């Protein structure tokens, strides 16, 4: 995807980047960065994403989004909120799937897993459509069951 399409709504206007640069993926974990990907340096609770910008660039990241200027050289764009920028580029990358979905959130202290599993089952039986579930224990996408990661 061309960087101008990927960064729409994420990078401040006038940010210096090659609008025709081809980006081949998005990563926010420097350990998984592949050549040509966009690396989003998220501020962390225990460790800070900007500490890993050099590692991401050494692995071939094409561009970095970060909240403060990194040390050293490399192609980067400063954004006011890296998490919001990640949300925007992810939506662009995947074609804004939330615009086609009904999203229901369940919050609370107890009973979230039970409530979401029951809700998924009811919705599928009533509508005849498949429902997805992103939960603490697992993620369900149609009939696919995936282990939950970073919950």
Residue ranges and their predicted role:
Residues 10, 86-151:
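Phosphate-binding loop of NTP-binding sites
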């Amino acid at each position: 995807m061309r960087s101008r399409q990927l960064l729409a709504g994420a990078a401040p206007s006038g940010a210096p980047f090659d609008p025709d640069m081809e980006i081949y993926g998005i990563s926010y974990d420097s350990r998984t960065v592949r050549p040509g990907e966009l690396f989003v340096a998220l501020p962390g609770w225990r460790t800070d994403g900007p500490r890993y910008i050099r590692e991401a660039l050494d692995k071939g990241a094409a561009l970095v989004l970060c909240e403060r200027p990194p040390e050293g050289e490399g192609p980067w764009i400063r954004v006011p909120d890296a998490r919001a920028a990640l949300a925007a580029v992810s939506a662009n990358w995947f074609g804004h799937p939330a615009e086609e979905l009904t999203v229901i959130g369940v919050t609370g202290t107890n009973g979230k897993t039970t409530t979401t599993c029951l809700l998924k089952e009811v919705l599928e039986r009533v509508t005849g459509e498949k429902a997805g579930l992103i939960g603490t224990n697992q993620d369900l996408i149609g009939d696919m069951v995936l282990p939950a990661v970073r919950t």
